[in-house]
Amino acid sequence: TLLKNSYYIPAERSIFTKDKTIISKRIQNKIVFSKNQEDFALSLFNLNGDEKGQFYDLACSFEKELSGGHIVLEKDGLFNNVKYLDFNENIKVSPKLLSTSLNEMAAIILYLKYILKEDDLLIIEEPEAHLHPKNQRILVKYLAEAINKGLNVLITTHSDYVIHQFNNLIRLGNLTSDEIFKLNYDENNVLNFKDVSIYHFKEQSKYSFVPE
């Protein structure tokens, strides 16, 4: 498949959703970003929340299962404010008052809602950061659905839960539709083993390599 666009979500992603002043600090040269961090930050703050992306509905299902709420964007001058809408209380909450896990997921949810399209490549560094094992499995379930709908995903992880969940979603292919449904999954979550590759890097002197 020919990739259209590639997007990188860094491990230190939550700071960009919690602190809108970080861009102005960068403009004033008070802090230094890597090129990847700068591209990531600008993509979030320049989002058009009125234009729903291809994976918008998937992202809404993901955040509902994850937290029962909704990540929303509010325009404030040049940049976006990220807010959390609590469905039960019908109130908007600042990211600074949210759990670390929700802040970590906010960027991934926003990318799925407004940026990513079929044949794009999404690169996520340590998606499991600050996530309870249950929520790690939920994340992988929706990444698998996005993969089945045409998104390419590359992640780096230290989590056995993430790896095991990918393996579980591959093994779902051996079950009937009814058996899959009883496990609270559906056929959109089933991965073909031919579409998944795992690389284990081993350290050797001054560099790391992937054994053949």
Where would I find each of the regions flagged by the language model?
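C-terminal lobe/lid and adjacent interdomain/linker elements of RecA-like ASCE P-loop ATPase modules
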Residues: 138-212
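Short, surface-exposed, charged/polar-biased interaction segments
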Residues: 30, 116-119, 129, 164, ...
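Phosphate-coordinating catalytic segments in nucleotide- and nucleic-acid-processing enzymes
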Residues: 1-121, 187-212
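Walker B catalytic acidic pair
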Residues: 125-127
